[in-house]
Design a protein with these regions (language model features):
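Conserved ABC ATPase "signature" region
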Residues: 119-137
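Conserved ABC transporter NBD signature motif
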Residues: 65-75, 83
């Protein structure tokens, strides 16, 4: 079994304000994410999911407890560069991460700051753009791209740093359905084909359903942790947290409430149709 690339031990965090210390945002969170996993972290605004994400590459440091990246303590200043090389971050608004006026120059920005030789930078840029399907836009101006394309450029900029893990904090929040699909397809491909560990912070049920593992957060605590088809079976528990379930699960749940014996493990429309077809032929 792969070793943990991300690990928290009783992680507690409180923001400091001018008035003093604010309420606890993360309260004793302990989890372990292994190399190669695709993990979605689901929760409402204020659940602590984005604050947790910012601990994974030491943007934030614990008030109490520990965070380890590939065994390195994020509070160890001497390890900060190594930690950020291993874990890349992608945020909600791609415009806040794009720094150059040409796509390929933007993707090259990170490696240049690491002192990577020019020939290797060229190779990294080409590979990163190919990985996100943006090669043909290498010489385009980023501001002329669609939202989904901009976010893919932001992901390419992180990939050019050669991280072992990418943490994406609500990367589709500002995108239309087409842009969302572009970004989600890219994330899944990077995990499946390149073996990059992915942590996706989201409040979209359909996005969370695509992960291999789902962590549900509420009020700074982990409320559930398992495979999506397992977590989403607890319809009443999720609804008590103000969360919904994917539409196929909701449909099957209503059928079950009416006395129809159907499983709640179908997360997609096709899986739901298959479950209903099987029911009708029995």
């Amino acid at each position: 079994m792969a070793e943990p690339i991300l690990q928290t031990e009783n992680l507690t965090f409180r923001y400091t304000t001018e008035e003093g210390v604010a309420p606890t945002v993360l309260d004793g969170v302990s989890l372990s994410i292994r190399a190669g996993e695709f993990v979605a972290v689901l929760g409402h605004n204020g659940s602590g999911k984005s604050t947790l994400a910012k601990h994974f590459n030491a943007i934030l440091l614990p008030t109490a407890g520990k965070v380890y990246v590939d065994g390195m303590d994020t509070c160890d200043e001497d390890k900060l560069l190594d930690i950020r090389r291993r874990v890349g971050m992608v945020f909600q608004n791609p415009d806040n991460q794009i720094v150059a006026s040409v796509v390929e120059e933007d993707v090259a920005f990170g490696p240049e700051n690491l002192g990577v030789p020019s020939a290797e930078i060229r190779e990294r840029v080409d590979q990163a753009l190919a990985a996100v399907g943006m090669t043909e836009y290498a010489r385009h101006a980023p501001h002329l791209l669609s939202g989904g394309q901009k976010q893919r450029v932001a992901i390419a900029g992180v990939l050019a740093m050669r991280p072992e893990c990418i943490v994406l904090d609500e990367p589709t929040a500002m995108l239309d359905p087409v842009g969302r699909k572009e970004v989600l397809d890219t994330i899944r491909r990077l995990n499946a084909e390149a073996g990059i560990t992915v942590v996706l912070i989201t409040h979209h049920m359909d996005e969370a359903a695509q992960a291999d593992r789902l962590i549900v957060m509420h009020d700074g605590h982990i409320m559930a942790d398992g495979r999506p088809e397992q977590v989403f079976q607890n319809v009443d528990g999720l609804r008590s947290l103000g969360l919904e379930v994917p539409e196929p699960v909701a449909l099957l749940y209503e059928l079950r409430q009416s006395g129809v014996d159907v499983p709640l493990t179908a997360l997609t429309v096709d899986e739901c149709a298959g479950a209903l077809a099987k029911l009708l032929t029995e």
